[in-house]
A protein has these predicted regions:
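The beta1-alpha1 cofactor-binding region of Rossmann-like NAD(H)/NADP(H)-dependent oxidoreductases
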Residues: 62-63, 83-94, 126, 137-140
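C-terminal helical subdomain
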Residues: 142, 244, 248-249, 254-256, ...
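Conserved internal alpha-helix within the Rossmann fold of NAD(P)-dependent oxidoreductases
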Residues: 139-144, 166, 224, 274
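Conserved glycine-rich Rossmann-like NAD(P)H-binding loop of the short-chain dehydrogenase/reductase
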Residues: 51-67
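Canonical Rossmann dinucleotide-binding motif of NAD(H)/NADP(H)-dependent dehydrogenases/reductases
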Residues: 25-56
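Catalytic loop of short-chain dehydrogenase/reductase
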Residues: 122-125, 129-130, 153-241, 250, ...
Length: 308
């Protein structure tokens, strides 16, 4: 629903006072990080078809971002581009400032940008841990910290997790118990500490002995999913915001660069769960949930994990 606001601008002059009425439309906006290719591009395409407002495709490379916009234009779809490197707080701040001035708030935020090292990667595991956790967890957290103050009531936030983000992949009982408390007693500070402990343990070479998996991507996405549950808890406690839904989704095994094009799903099919979460109706009870690629809700803590 589009809202209209009337502002009265009073101009005072020595001789008289004139009343000017300015009508403007409050534009809705949906932001997709990492939107120039893969699942992110599929999400932008899907939102451009159904979202009543501007769709902002963001990417860290302007040329690739603009090429993605032009590709959608050839399909008769309109999206806008904004430069964004989620690893650069100043870049995130520039986006936040633009959104605040241009739109006044955020209606949909899809945190899709992420990285994954290939199985054949030659970088040391400790380096992979440092880079992956920094990007997939802490940089997404920074985006949320800077953009969440702009969320409007009724906003939808989608954190693109993964089947790798399923809690059952954490085998250490103590670690699993701590992650499972997200959404109830786990704090951001303790969760941050868990992420840092993994990086430190990977550097020391004793991460497996502590119950961590041998996958930096798994840890990053489990952390993102746990963060999602805390975010929903905090937003639900905020009386200034109504009906904000924050969910984490598994896009499926998708034919993208990240999967080395081994996935059976198309980017459009991979976008399905994100589009479902981004367009949940008013008053939805789907909040803080783990949504599978077929849009079914999965018990993130107890499972069982469905088929890929």
């Amino acid at each position: 629903m589009i809202k209209h606001t009337c502002l009265q601008n009073v101009v005072t002059s020595p001789s008289n006072i004139k009343h000017h009425f300015i009508f403007f439309r409050i534009m809705k906006v949906a932001i997709v990080t990492g939107g120039n290719k893969g699942v992110g591009f599929g999400i932008c395409r899907g939102l451009a078809k159904v979202f009543d407002g501007d769709v902002l495709l963001t990417a860290r490379n302007e040329e690739r971002g603009m090429n993605a916009v032009k590709e959608l234009e050839k399909e008769g779809l309109t999206v806008k581009f904004h430069l964004l490197d989620i690893n650069d707080p100043k870049s995130v701040g520039a986006l936040a400032a633009f959104i605040k001035e241009r739109y006044g708030g955020i209606d949909v935020l899809v945190n899709n940008a992420a990285i994954a090292f290939k199985q054949a990667a030659t970088e040391p595991f400790a380096l992979q841990a440092k880079v992956t956790i920094a990007t997939n967890y802490f940089s997404v957290q920074d985006c949320c910290n800077q953009l969440f103050p702009l969320l409007r009531s009724g906003a939808r936030v989608v954190n693109v997790s993964s089947m790798a983000g399923f809690l059952g992949l954490i085998k250490g009982a103590d670690l699993k118990s701590k992650f499972a408390s997200s959404g109830s007693t786990l704090t951001y500070e303790v969760l941050d500490g868990l992420m840092k402990d993994f990086v430190d343990s990977a550097n020391a070479g004793d991460h497996a002995a502590k119950g961590w998996p041998n996958s930096t991507y798994v840890v990053s996405k489990v952390g993102l999913s746990a963060m999602t549950r805390i975010q929903q808890q905090k937003v639900s406690e905020d009386s200034s915001l109504k009906d904000v839904a924050i969910n984490h989704v598994h896009p499926g095994y998708v034919d993208t660069d990240m999967s080395s094009h081994k996935g059976p799903l198309t980017p459009e099919e991979g976008a399905k769960s994100s589009l479902f979460a981004a367009t949940l109706p008013q008053g939805t009870n789907i909040k803080g949930k783990y949504i599978w690629h077929n849009c079914e809700l999965v018990d993130w803590v107890n499972g069982p994990k469905p088929d890929v």
